[in-house]
Structure formats: C-alpha cells, structure tokens
Regions:
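Metal-assisted phosphate- and nucleotidyl-transfer catalytic regions
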Residues: 1-91, 113-114, 119-126, 131-132
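Active-site pocket scaffolds in enzymes
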Residues: 99-100, 104-170
Length: 170
C-alpha cells in the first residue's frame, strides 16, 4: 500500500458536540438546523478534521456530550440527560463510539421504556436485577480504520465483503 503509518501523539483533544457545531458555523460557515444537532451530520463529521487540525493540530478528535435521544438505551446519562460517552473522529471519519454503560437496574429499565423497548430486551434487562458493576464499552469500525490507515479511497475496498443499505449478502 506504500503508506507510512504515523504514530499519533496523545492526548487526543476533545470537544462538546454543541461547541463543535458553534465553531463549524463561526469558522467555516457550516450551518444545520437545530433538529440535526443531536448527532454529527456526515458533513460535520468531515469538517471536524479541518477543525481539529486548525485548532489542535491533531488528526483525532473526541466528540463528547451527546444528547440521549440518538444513542442506545444502555449508555449511561448524567443528571442532565447527557450521555457519558464519545465518538472518536479520525481524519473526518468516525472510527469508534464508546460509553460508560448503565448498570443500575431502575435506570436501564426506564431508558429502555423511553426508547419504546419492552419484551424484546427483557432478557438483557434481567441481568441487571442481580447487580452489575459499573462498566463501559466501545465498538471500533475496523473497516473504516483500515481504509484510513492504508489510504484506501472507499470503505467498500477495505472490507472483505461489502455490506450496505442495498446489499446484505454477498
């Protein structure tokens, strides 16, 4: 692939989601309706690379303080309903999402109900009746990471078998 892998320096900078949208508008004239600001739009995700480079001289940016409505019911929230999680953006592409997980039975049941979930997740919720320690988790986009690391132009070319909205089997 004739690419040089550069080991990044740490710590990676972090910004609140609301602050990112504010800076994208002020610096680059990027504006979206308030209804879209509960997550990063695809274009906002791309622009975070420029923002991270301009502001922090970093290819990486942790995005924090997402509102709960767009995330999984098992992500822990603070007293204001803000998730205790993050997205990690590298070169304008989300490569991982992580969060502290909810471990308190009453809270996770309430969160599941808010999302309209019921019997289909009962088996999962039952684990928490017996006590669960505080914990966290993350999911990494290995195909996206491979694409960026090797300079491959499309994630379709970085996967063994591409699956997408219109193609689920080989």
């Amino acid at each position: 692939f004739d690419t040089e892998v550069v080991v990044p320096t740490t710590p990676f900078p972090k910004m609140r989601l609301a602050d990112i949208y504010k800076e994208l508008e002020e610096r680059y004239g990027y504006h979206v309706d308030d209804s879209e600001k509960n997550d990063l739009t695809t274009e906002a995700e791309r622009l975070t690379y420029k923002l991270a480079m301009d502001k922090f001289n970093s290819e990486f940016l942790f995005v924090i303080d997402f509102p709960a409505e767009k995330r999984a019911f098992y992500h822990m929230r603070d007293e204001n309903g803000i998730l205790q999680g993050y997205d990690l953006i590298w070169r304008g592409v989300e490569i991982t999402t992580g969060a502290q997980r909810e471990h308190r039975y009453e809270e996770i049941v309430k969160n599941a109900k808010e999302k309209g979930l019921g019997e289909d997740v009962k088996f999962y919720l039952d684990f928490f009746k017996h006590g669960c320690p505080p914990h966290g988790g993350f999911a990494i986009g290995v195909d996206r990471l491979t694409m960026l690391l090797l300079g491959i132009p499309s994630v379709k070319e970085a996967q063994f078998l591409f699956r997408g909205p219109n193609r689920l089997k080989p």
